[in-house]
């Protein structure tokens, strides 16, 4: 096996995207994604059974397209990497079973990859091809909102803070439903918020009270954590009050004020975590990283704090196989032993476990 510039095939199936990506070392050769999002729209959210069946239908065509785009054959691959968690159990199982079948059929080593750490690994596919020292990662998606410290992407990832209830993306979807904006909620709210007044309504910022924050010397229990369930409830009560009075609901203003509350608390706590933990470089990733206001305010606050911000291209922020392949390549180059084929998908895989 080539351990200096390994050709790695990555498979992603943790939610509603079937992704296959191929990298050679830190060079991206192909990144093919098939999404089942349209099949979930009428339900207002991802239906696990539908997502799993969509992965079954999409995997072989997606694999074939990725190989063709990369100009390689399956036999050329040095190793296979697959998301084994966290995610939807049934969806993960489809990708893991497919990866195991390929590994057995080809005799290639198989690496079970942490989906969240893979979002950091995608930063290695950028121009510099190396992750800097003193690196942090802010991951914001439909299923996760976390701030990480990365000492080594292959074996030393520390969770500094996370949401204690809804993820930010999940809150977007639920509020969009309240406002009649449909699914997915993130893009709809982002677009509508541009026409609204974010200062028209003041929504709460969860876990920002002194009893939760504490101080740098004596941190509170949730200094770097987030909570969005109370914000979601506040939006619902706001809508109910307008409707009870018979007034028109100012949907654009509510969308803008909600988004500002989410982005404000995410960025303020992320920057706080960075400054108090010696983090000088921050990677922003996850599907919600496509949000224009989140990108804007993160950049502003990082610049003010002297933190260098990196945001991958949008197609690499959302779930994809290239990020899985990128992390797999790092494990190969670091001499980490393969996972074998006896591991099981882990829907609640902790971010501190880089590879199963």
Swiss-Prot record:
It is an enzyme of class 2 (transferase). InterPro entries: ATPase_NBD, Gcp-like_dom, KAE1/TsaD, TsaD. GO terms for biological process: tRNA threonylcarbamoyladenosine modification. Binds 1 Fe(2+) ion per subunit. GO terms for cellular component: cytoplasm. It catalyses: L-threonylcarbamoyladenylate + adenosine(37) in tRNA = N(6)-L-threonylcarbamoyladenosine(37) in tRNA + AMP + H(+). PANTHER family: TRNA N6-ADENOSINE THREONYLCARBAMOYLTRANSFERASE, TRNA N6-ADENOSINE THREONYLCARBAMOYLTRANSFERASE, MITOCHONDRIAL. Required for the formation of a threonylcarbamoyl group on adenosine at position 37 (t(6)A37) in tRNAs that read codons beginning with adenine. Is involved in the transfer of the threonylcarbamoyl moiety of threonylcarbamoyl-AMP (TC-AMP) to the N6 group of A37, together with TsaE and TsaB. TsaD likely plays a direct catalytic role in this reaction. This is tRNA N6-adenosine threonylcarbamoyltransferase.
